[in-house]
A protein has these predicted regions:
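Cofactor- and metal-binding active-site motifs of prokaryotic enzymes
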Residues: 1-120
Length: 120
């Protein structure tokens, strides 16, 4: 599996610029940012990669042997990875409402028992 890992520090514009240096044509992006910069980071990544599914999270991250609570980490996936993304709506009121769509997306990628990850 071909992947890209990039990191950036500072305000979202600078951090995103640093983190995506060398990232071209990803099939999907997973990013980890600080809570205070999360929204702007997501917006900037979407501007740069408008047709790429992008999933973000907050929290402590371990990248290249460094543990960090601030800054940005970007993980890019490429065409050798099958990706399906969606939004689970009504999660607080009726979490099973999105089950049909989720099962459809899972079937589309033909998951195996040792080569599949589901990120919630």
């Amino acid at each position: 599996m071909k992947t890209f890992i990039g990191t950036g520090v500072g305000q979202p514009e600078a951090a995103v610029h640093q983190a995506v240096q060398g990232l071209t044509s990803p099939s999907a992006i997973l990013f980890m940012a600080s809570y205070e910069h999360f929204k702007e980071t997501a917006s900037r990544l979407k501007e740069l990669f408008p047709d790429t599914p992008c999933i973000g999270t907050i929290g402590t991250r371990l990248v290249n042997g460094q543990v960090n609570d601030s800054g940005l980490a970007v993980l890019g996936f490429f065409s050798d990875v099958k990706i399906r993304c969606g939004i689970i709506t009504e999660a607080s009121r009726c979490p099973v409402a999105g089950t049909t769509q989720l099962l459809k997306q899972i079937a589309e990628i033909s998951p195996g028992t040792d080569d599949t990850v589901c990120v919630e």
